[in-house]
Amino acid sequence: MPVTYQILPRHNLVYVRYSGAMMVEDSLKAFDTYARDPGARPGQRHLVDLSRITDMERDFARIMQLQATKGAELAMRETETLMVYFANTPLSLRAAALAKNGWSVSQGVIAVVFEREDAVMSALGLPCETIDDMLQTDLRKID
C-alpha cells in the first residue's frame, strides 16, 4: 500500500508516509484502519510525509470527500489535532496545500506545511533533525 502509518506513543504522534501515487481510496483505507487502531488517541499529532509521492489523484470531489470523512472523525474527538505536512517537491507541495486547505479550525484541525525536515522536527518539539532520526530514536527507546 502506498500509504502507511505508525503510532509513536512516546511522541503523541502518528507518522503517515505516502509513496508512489497518492490515491484517495488508499488514504480512506489507511485512515479507517488508524481510526480503529487501539493505539489511536484524541489529540495525537499527525506528521504526514509526502516527500515520496510521484503522482496524485486529481479527482477533487473525491479528495474533498476524504477530507470530510477525516474531519468528521477528528471533530468527534473534541480536541484539537495538529496536522504537520512534510513536502519538499513541487508535487508534494501541491498535495500538501490541497490537504491543508481542506481543513478548518472548526473541524478541530490545525494544519501546517514545512519543506525542511528540521523545521518539521522543531514544530513538533522533537530533538531530532530528520524523520529517520525520529523513527530510530523511537525504536531504540522501545528496545
Question: Language-model features: where?
Answer:
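Amphipathic, Lys/Arg-enriched alpha-helical "gate/interface" segment within cytosolic domains
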Residues: M1-D143
